[in-house]
């Protein structure tokens, strides 16, 4: 694929363009009926608003409002966030509730889910 002319890097002699990579979060949403939903995003508030509005939100959450963020943790890279989400979604409900209640730190969450930062 050939890059579009407007997508090419514009650099001047001695200057580098700094590309800011987004910080990814894992979050757990609680619903009116006590269900838990786990997801990842770069902007938790925006994503919850999308879930609440319907259109771009998860089908699982439709009709389950009000939604409440019960847990969120900043993880950094997208790959790490996806691995944590995958492990968290496969945990029994009791484990998820314990993680939410204990407010595990990033390091403790990774250790608990047996996820390493390196792939």
Region locations from a protein language model:
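Short arginine-rich
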Residues: 86-101
């Amino acid at each position: 694929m050939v890059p579009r002319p407007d997508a090419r890097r514009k650099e001047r002699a001695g200057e580098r363009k700094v590309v800011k990579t987004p910080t990814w979060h894992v979050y757990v949403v609680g619903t009116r009926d006590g269900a838990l939903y786990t997801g990842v995003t770069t902007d938790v508030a925006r994503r919850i608003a999308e879930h609440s509005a319907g259109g771009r939100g998860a089908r699982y959450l439709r009709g389950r409002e009000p939604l409440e963020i019960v847990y969120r943790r900043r993880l950094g890279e997208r790959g790490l966030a996806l691995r944590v989400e995958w492990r968290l979604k496969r945990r029994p409900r009791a484990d998820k509730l314990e993680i939410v209640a204990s407010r595990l730190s990033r390091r403790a969450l990774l250790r608990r889910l047996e996820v390493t930062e390196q792939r």
